[in-house]
């Protein structure tokens, strides 16, 4: 516990808050190029093959981003739009690819929650 004199001389040190999506550099989304598209398995209680992509962003970072929805058309060198948002059961995956933007197609036959998966009204 500092004394009053120490507080007058030095003040209190500010607590640094680390950003959850540093690679976006304070932007809502970033464009990037897929370096590798692959599947990975989730943490312990869950079991699946989650589709993810390694993306080189325009900010210079290379991040792992989740591909939401059923089926996708992404491959190496595809240009994608990346937003923040982690996947709870995939360690190290802190970004999502936006469906229906740039080279990423929307989800086929999607009827509900269409705006989240880049599908136009039928």
Swiss-Prot record:
Biological source species: Cyanidioschyzon merolae (strain NIES-3377 / 10D) (Unicellular red alga)
Tagged with keyword NAD: no
Function per UniProt: With S4 and S5 plays an important role in translational accuracy. Located at the interface of the 30S and 50S subunits.
Lineage: Eukaryota, Rhodophyta, Bangiophyceae, Cyanidiales, Cyanidiaceae
Quaternary structure note: Part of the 30S ribosomal subunit.
Family to which this protein belongs: Belongs to the universal ribosomal protein uS12 family.
Protein name: Small ribosomal subunit protein uS12c
GO molecular function, one term: structural constituent of ribosome
Cellular localization per UniProt: Plastid, Chloroplast
């Amino acid at each position: 516990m500092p004394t009053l004199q120490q507080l007058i001389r030095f003040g209190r040190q500010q607590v640094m808050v680390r950003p959850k999506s540093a690679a976006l550099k304070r932007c809502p989304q970033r464009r990037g190029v897929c370096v590798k598209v692959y599947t990975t398995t989730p943490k312990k209680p869950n079991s699946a093959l989650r589709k993810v992509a390694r993306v080189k962003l325009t900010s210079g970072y290379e991040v792992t981003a989740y591909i939401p929805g059923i089926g996708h058309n992404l491959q190496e060198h595809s240009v994608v739009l990346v937003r923040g948002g982690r996947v709870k059961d995939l360690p190290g995956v802190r970004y999502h690819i936006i469906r229906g933007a740039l080279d990423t197609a929307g989800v086929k036959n999607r009827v509900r929650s269409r705006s989240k998966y880049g599908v136009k009204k039928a």
